[in-house]
Amino acid sequence: MDPQNQHGSGSSLVVIQQPALDNRQRLDYEREIQPAAILSLDQIKAIRGSNEYTEGPSVVKRPAPRTAPRQEKHERTHEIIPINVNNNYEHRPTSHLGHTGLSNNTRGPILSRSTSTGSAASSGSNSSASSEQGLLGRSPPTRPIPGHRSERAIRTQPKQLIVDDLKGSLKEDLTQHKFICEQCGKCKCGECTAPRTLPSCLACNRQCLCSAESMVEYGTCMCLVKGIFYHCSNDDEGDSYSDNPCSCSQSQCCSRYLCMGAMSLFLPCLLCYPPAKGCLKLCKGCYDWIHRPGCRCENSNTVYCKLESCSSRGLGKPS
């Protein structure tokens, strides 16, 4: 009874303390000596009836309840392993050694599986916790408020300065009119002395040109005459009288006038073309006289001066 009590007390000590290194070596030596036992399907039993694997990331959210069963697994392994603290391996009988060896062989791989699963689960939980802490520690910096961005954009690109620059360039363009006539006091640059034409616009989805010239041509059927002359003319000769059929300077003047006279019998509106053309020239002259800001003098001297200094002198003289 005494050795059994000692053995029982020794096994109870194993639950609290892990075995020493020399005891493990002796156990490995005994396992190597004993023949490997073949187990039947009835003797093989599962440790747990259900696994703890989940498909979702809920495992990381529950680290606290998992620590308790892992400690119980390690304690079970320490309880099952039979270790003699008194080191009395030589006094054991052969039958007892065989029984213990068989039990060790039967439970050895199961214990190794349980310890491996426990270590894998613990390492997985530790790695997940460490990765989560690393991600939390390396979180990106907070984004600035959109209001601050707009203030920065306004500081770097002020719109007021750009508008001032544009106004300054426009003022410089207005002060470029420096060639003033001595008689009328008006500018003599090419832009100011260019003749002004009557206004025109595009109609019918920008396909038809609405102008005074086109109204005269379509109203007097001159467009039909131009089309006939265009198809009858020879382009190799270079005589484009189809654009101006009433001109006297181009070739075949008599034949053109005879053809237009014959067409006027069927199209009497062609007779209205000469007076309509005269009225158009008169309207152009009046419009140009009113809207042209430059000088109209034929023979006059040009004075180079600034517009601001010569404006007062120009206003005093008659135009």
From Swiss-Prot:
Region described as Disordered: 54-160
Its membrane topology: Peripheral membrane protein
Entry superkingdom: Eukaryota
Gene Ontology BP term (one): negative regulation of Ras protein signal transduction
InterPro entries with a match to the protein in the record: Sprouty (IPR007875), Sprouty_domain (IPR051192)
Bias-annotated ranges (Low complexity): 112-131
Cystine residue pairs: none
Record carries keyword Acetylation: yes
Basic and acidic residues biased stretches: 69-79
Broad class of where this protein is predominantly found: cytoplasm
TM segment ranges: none
Entry-linked Pfam families: Sprouty
A cellular component annotation (GO) from this entry: cytosol
Residues covered by the SPR domain: 183-295
Modified residues (N-acetylmethionine): M1
Subunit structure: Forms heterodimers with SPRY2. Interacts with TESK1. Interacts with CAV1 (via C-terminus).
Membership in a protein family: Belongs to the sprouty family.
Role played: Inhibits fibroblast growth factor (FGF)-induced retinal lens fiber differentiation, probably by inhibiting FGF-mediated phosphorylation of ERK1/2. Inhibits TGFB-induced epithelial-to-mesenchymal transition in lens epithelial cells.
Description of its domains: The Cys-rich domain is responsible for the localization of the protein to the membrane ruffles.
Protein name: Protein sprouty homolog 1
Species of origin: Cervus elaphus (Red deer)
Top-level taxonomy: Eukaryota, Metazoa, Chordata, Craniata, Vertebrata
Gene designation: SPRY1
